[in-house]
């Protein structure tokens, strides 16, 4: 009898707790439709369900806000202005938003919970962002650790981007084995030397990342990316390899791939100032886009030079393209510096790190380096070294433009 009574009492207690939880949920968790007012325009208002994040609610309504980290709160790109209904700003947002900006309503859409009706402001250009399912045209090695992914836009569609812009690419859940990569023989030596074929990328959820475009606006119907494989650092080989780069490197001709865009802020200024482009690694992409756009589409007569850093000749690419541009345009020159040339390279060009080469062979004797515009994209250490050198020369922040893909 005592056992039965104990079971009954336990059951009643559990039921009571469930009722308390359900009651609390009904009071604390909103139900019904939530209306998100956008730019005070009734036609742009979004009706959604509570419980998710603002970034997802916007995407569900076909409004794609840039988020290079896929909504993790680390890139700080998904900035919107929340005029009401967003709650208090979170500590994760304050890494990217100043207190002054927060007072103005600046928030990260990926961190704002949708709980009540909201009133937000978005830049008008966001409404031009679209999503496309593209087809892989080619995916070829251009260097040991860099591939050129070329995508075909669906027939009748176009991506109205500006040179220096970027798209976001989606990777589904996947299991990629590096052993399945088709690495050309000329690059296999380093892959085997560093035992890279042992790695695998196992991902159970969709991932979104941003990549700058290497093509320029008049290369119609395609999107071209330079993608560096993100392998674990040598001193910490147990770190998982890069999710998105592993996926992109697995793509083959004919595969489907979803992108959204265009996005961007790394655009050329409309001035007559001299342009100095500095790149390294996969930072080649926006450099190619900008330089081709200036010379082939705009037929610019601005003085410009391109300084690219690589380890060896094996890591140089688009050489014929830039040689051709230099031959066709008297106002353009380009130089490559190798930091670790191989004996078989028979290299007689510049050697060393690109920031030193640029300074010693050009800017040191330039009559007014502070008047030039500097456009750069490369590994974080390169960016920091170049910026430090430019600061020492008296170049103001407004003339230093950075596509900080690795920051």
Curated annotation (Swiss-Prot):
Keywords: 2Fe-2S, Cell inner membrane, Cell membrane, FAD, Flavoprotein, Ion transport, Iron, Iron-sulfur, Membrane, Metal-binding, NAD, Sodium, Sodium transport, Translocase, Transmembrane, Transmembrane helix, Transport, Ubiquinone. It catalyses: a ubiquinone + n Na(+)(in) + NADH + H(+) = a ubiquinol + n Na(+)(out) + NAD(+). The chain crosses the membrane at residues 3-23. Residues 129-269 form the FAD-binding FR-type domain. Its EC number is 7.2.1.1. It is found in: Cell inner membrane. It is a single-pass membrane protein. One of its GO terms (cellular component) is plasma membrane. Pfam families: FAD_binding_6, Fer2, NAD_binding_1. GO terms for molecular function: 2 iron, 2 sulfur cluster binding; electron transfer activity; metal ion binding; oxidoreductase activity, acting on NAD(P)H, quinone or similar compound as acceptor. The keyword Transmembrane applies. Binds 1 [2Fe-2S] cluster. [2Fe-2S] cluster binds at residues 69, 75, 78, 110. One of its GO terms (biological process) is sodium ion transport. Its cofactor is [2Fe-2S] cluster; FAD. It comes from the Bacteria. Residues 272-389 are annotated as: Catalytic. Composed of six subunits; NqrA, NqrB, NqrC, NqrD, NqrE and NqrF. NQR complex catalyzes the reduction of ubiquinone-1 to ubiquinol by two successive reactions, coupled with the transport of Na(+) ions from the cytoplasm to the periplasm. The first step is catalyzed by NqrF, which accepts electrons from NADH and reduces ubiquinone-1 to ubisemiquinone by a one-electron transfer pathway. Belongs to the NqrF family. NCBIfam families: nqrF. This is Na(+)-translocating NADH-quinone reductase subunit F. It comes from Vibrio parahaemolyticus serotype O3:K6 (strain RIMD 2210633). The gene is nqrF.
